[in-house]
Amino acid sequence: MRAKRGAVGKVMMSGSRHNKLAESSRVPPLAREYISAMATDRELDRFMALSSTASSGASGSTHSCALGSVPPPGCASMEHESRPESGHRRRTKSSDHRSPDERGEAKEQLRELSVSPPPSKHKISQFTSPKSEVTKTKPNEYTIIPIVLASSPSFRSVAVTQTMSQSAEDIRTPTKSPQMQNKKTQTPESVLKSHKRLEWDPSADVGYCKRAMSMSNISTLERSVLEDCSWRQPTQQRPEANLDGVQPLLAEEPSPMLDKPTPPLACSTFVNRSERTKSLNSGMESSLSSNKGDPRKKCQRKSRRQDSEVSSCQTDCRSSSQKESTQGSSEAKDIRGNFTTEGTQCSYNRNDTEIDSIMEEEESIDRRKKDDLRISSRVQDPQISSRRPSVSSSRRESLSSYRRDDSRLNSPNSSRLGSEVSSRVESSRSSSRRESQTNSVYGSLSASSFDYHMHMAQEVEVLKHNQRRQQEMEVEPKKQLEKEQHQNDMQQGEPKGRELKDKNHHSGREQQEIQPLMRDQRKAEQRHEKDHQLEREQQGIQQLSKGQRKAKKREKEREQERQYTAAQFEKIRSNRRHVNKENQKPENPVVNPSTGVTASTSTTSLDVGSGSRPGGELDLGIDLLCSLVKSRSLSQGQKKKLVRDIARRISCLELTESSTSSRSLSSSSKEQLKVPTGSLQQVAATNTNQSNARSSSKAERIAPPVPAPRKRAAIGSSSPLPESVSYSGSTSGSGEVITQKTNIPNRNASTDADIEPLDLQDWLNPMTLSEIEFEERLKGGTDSERRRQLHWVKTEINRMQEFKNLLENISLPSKSQKKANTESATAAQIPSSMRCMGDQKERPDKEYLLRQEMSAEAESKEMENSETTTTPPPPVRIESVGVNVTNSDPSTLPAPPPTQPPPPPPHLNQRNLQNRKKMATPLLVSGSSTSGGGRSESVCSFVQQRQRQFREHYQNQQQQQFVLLQQQKLYQLQKQLNQQKDILIQRQQHCGQCAQCGHQRTCIHQQNCPRRQQEAEEQPDEREQYMQMQYAQAAGSAYATPHQSGSSGADKNEAIYYQVVNSQGVASYVQATMVSTETQNEASATGGAGGSAITRSTTTTTNSSSSMMCISSDMSVPMGMMNTCETTTTTTTHQYDDVACQRVRRGHKETTMNAESMQRQTLQVRPRAISYVIQFTPTGSSEVIEKPPSLQDQLQLARPEFCANAKQRKAILNEMQMIRNARRQELDNVLSQSTSMEALNRHLEQLPPPANTRVRLFTTREMKAITSKRCKNLPEVLAAQSRQEEEQRRRSNRLMRDVFNKRLKSRVASGQISLNHSMAIM
């Protein structure tokens, strides 16, 4: 490494104190010394001078950015004459590589150097070519980085207000290489182990294995030093994130660093100065000629790059130099050797015209440099002076990119454009989409949208320069001669272009086979063309004068633009057979007048040449606009001009098609009117466009000139060819709606795609079922459904009014009695109920009539059900508005036949959900379509409804608990009466024989239980009221009828069915119907008020008592004592907290049920929470079951001795406490009065004895005995005793074992080897 560095030459920042200038800079000396110390090992100076802050590997080579580098003497100086005093120099460290004479010469040369001005964003890049900007300097060149204090606000605003198409610093994670695209996500540890991309650097994030991997090549500290100098990234560099999207553009750039192998790890940031020995003029010539390159040569290079990508999957997509170096080391060396010559060989025609254009470009650049220098010295505004070179450089690079796009899309022989153009357009579309995705993810990094942020003064200057150059060019003569010469050049260049085009049409396998031969041919051609080009340059310089070259260049640009336009029109005409199917128009529209729906069958296209609509031109224009703008090297003026040209071409294309489209629209509308009326015709189709005829005509009239690429409006006109129909595959941006109905094969199907399986047709439609139905309701069936519902409501209102008049005319004997009852009931109401009745009177007539109509419908249904039972018919309900109620008999009442409920909406009839495989979204179909009923059934409104229901349920629970607390206070008054009787009975029992009374009570309880069960089986004593919410389902009628009697009741007596008619929008109503099934006598043996502790909760209904009703926004909730209620459904038993259902025990005064016993109530549901009172008329004096005994009472009955002892102990303790208090008081008095000890002793003898001597249950000895007895029986004591016994047993066993062993050994030792069992050793 050190030898290499010695050969290359070290460059370091002047960090020592003796090299500093007199005045200090903004960069502190400590930071400068730190960076210089780190730069010794990493050659950071050369890196900072020749690299950029963002990754320069994005463009395929190490772009250099000379930070105010001193040009050679041959170049014109573009710097001010005043050196900034705070600027610092960077000198080459030559103490160990140069002699003192060379150092002295270098110092003298440094004193004579011109001073670099305060650098702007784009002043840096004006020496470099637009794409490959390698500044070739001498090894001993001085690099000066001026550091200027941005004190003036005008200078500081340059970086703020300047909005050019340059990319910002990119410090994100590096994008994946093509080898890693299809692999799984790798952890940082596996990346380090497998690829070794990163290397730790203590001062920066510089160390990356590959040049293209590096995201920010210098540390934050070093970047702050550079930003302190107002240094910015050049215009044409791209961030790392856009590598994949900009590959086609990157691959065309020549890489000047190809002849240097990729250094390992952190060495990739080093720059070899030995390679930069050529002069700046030769570098500019080669870069200019490469940027004005031949389109055929670039096509050839593109095909070569495709060949290398096909043959080797290991190419690196991050640099174009590595793309072509993967074929082999020898081939890579040849390519590197010829790659620099390749740029000079690329010219539009291989003859004199290219030499002239090169010379013209050089002279125009020199002239612009001089003009810019003049302007910068004249104009004092630093914004304009810094803007000028950037405008000129961006103008040059935009010209080159324009020609490159031109050469990519343009070709003289248009007969060969057929399949090649289509494939190239597809590839450009995919690349543009990929880049747009990258930009959308990582922010707007490329100039995909136009930003015109130039100041007026700068724009005026640009326009003046353009006008001046235009006048100079137009004055030059001999334009006709150059035209003829240009035509000859075009004719000579045609055969070579044909040869290159034939090479591009090879397949992938053939390319792999003949790749070595093509490589050799290319190398030979490159050498041959290089020699020819040098000769042509010399001849062109001698032949043409400066004026002729200028005029010829101007004419050549015009001719290229004309050829470009002609090529685009040719591509449009040749691409019509491959036009996008989304822009084809449907054929054979069918109108169903019942819903006003146009159903157009869309099938596969039989004739590919049927695309005569301007959709292809629109797509091509949009893709062309995106591909040209994304090149991001266009200047502002060229962007505006480009957009205007494309918009003008598209508008011209649309004008030619407008007359035919209007004629086809009128003919299709006439055909639609001829379709006969009838039921909704179902057409088998993979897609169905449904819209109103008015909306389709509007979409036809208003066609946007340039629609968005993914929101193309499908115009509802038929194709001119009869057998061709089209797809419409994406959601249209206009008012038209893509829907799908039940797929039924029909004879109208014209192709095989129409008679696909129904499951396959479902998936051909991109919309979900909920979206389809929502769009259908918005367009088709809402108005007709609403009209049908309103018509049915009107007929029902008329029928109910006639029925009401009929009932009022009938008089019965019990009419006066019922009036008296209702008057007394309303007189007992709370004033809040009067207010509610007043509110009901003030409601509109529609709500009143709707409530009347619904209640009357339920009445008629109830009358039909009651005819089958033995009970008398229920009376007419009491209306809260004050309608007279009469009791009627079915024999005397001719009930008019009820009308059928309205049929469900048409979209429910059309849908056959069994055939559909997509998931159907659950719908809530409301009964009437008032208040936008169709829109309330979409997915969003369904979610909102669920959220609203949850909030109302929670609020309802809170309010219910609060109301229950208030009601419990009212019930306490009724409970106290019954509790007093129980207390009296219990006291009498306590005074007498407690045990016998308890035994008698248990016997009575055991005798009463089977008796009550027999009563419940034979003669049920309860009438249970269950609430069951009947919601209208989507498949059935919107109005649920009450079930038959006893369908969901446990005891099969009565059931109240609450039916929510419409719970959305307007105020809806709940119809509560009591269906009586049996009438039997009730004999209640026990009475008393009920409590809420048993499973059967009861309510007390007295003559004037009332139950509270808490109204939520969707349903009425009766508030009882119980918080939960059981609602028996068909499957399970649910617990509802918001509806309390009570079972009421009634009296048995009458053998037959009176008409007053069954009173139908109308519960009104309002959209907001309102509490009001509803009266329940009592049938007579009803008794309540007796309350179950409390735990204390049950303890008294079970263990009376324990209770007596407890009371005695409590009394003794209270007495002892009183005695202690009295003794304490007397003792205080004695102490306060006595003055001597004798008097104190005398008073103490007079004190009462202590409490424990006067009141005692047992003595101390008895207490100790009792305590010890209890302690001995404790489990801890017993366990300890057992433990001790076990230890004693083990100890004795061990002792016996030892004695036995000792005696046995002694016997054996004495010679007794046999042991008789009868002998006792122990």
Swiss-Prot record:
Compositional bias per record (Polar residues), positions renumbered to this chain: 165-189, 309-318, 338-350, 678-696, 737-751, 822-832
The residues forming the signal peptide are: none
Task: Report biased composition (Acidic residues) as residue ranges.
Answer: 354-364
Q: What is its main location?
A: cytoplasm
Which parts of this chain are annotated as the region ALMS motif? 1190-1309
Bias (Low complexity) occurs at 53-62, 279-292, 319-330, 409-430, 594-605, 657-669, 714-735, 1092-1107
User: Region Interaction with Klp10A: start and end of each range?
Assistant: 1115-1322
Phenotype upon knockout is: RNAi-mediated knockdown in asymmetrically dividing male germline stem cells (GSCs), results in loss of centriole duplication and thereby leads to complete loss of centrosomes (and centrioles) from all male germ cells. In GSCs, results in the enrichment of both SAK and Sas-6 at the remaining elongated mother centrioles. Does not change Klp10A centrosome localization in male germline stem cells. RNAi-mediated knockdown in symmetrically dividing spermatogonia, does not affect normal centrosome duplication.
Please list the tissues where expression of this protein has been recorded.
Expressed in all germlines, including germline stem cells and spermatogonia.
- The UniProt regions of compositional bias labelled Pro residues, in chain numbering, are 893-907
GO biological process entries: male germ-line stem cell asymmetric division; positive regulation of centriole replication; positive regulation of centrosome duplication
The superkingdom listed in its UniProt entry is Eukaryota
Cite the GO molecular-function annotations of the record. Answer: kinase binding; kinesin binding
Listed InterPro entries:
ALMS_motif (IPR029299)
Q: Which intervals carry biased composition (Basic and acidic residues)?
A: 78-111, 365-375, 394-408, 464-487, 495-512, 519-538
UniProt keywords (A-Z) are: Cytoplasm, Cytoskeleton
Sequence segments annotated as region (Disordered)? 1-26, 53-135, 165-193, 252-442, 464-614, 657-752, 814-844, 856-911, 1083-1109
Example GO CC term: the record gives: centriole
Q: Does the keyword Cytoplasm apply?
A: yes
What is the annotated quaternary arrangement, including any partners? Interacts (via C-terminus) with Klp10A. Interacts with SAK.
Function according to Swiss-Prot or TrEMBL? In asymmetrically dividing germline stem cells (GSCs), plays a critical role in ensuring centrosome duplication, which is essential for the production of centrosomes and centrioles in all downstream germ cells. Might recruit SAK for daughter centriole duplication.
Give the similarity note. Answer: Belongs to the ALMS1 family.
* Protein name, as recorded: Centrosome-associated protein Alms1a
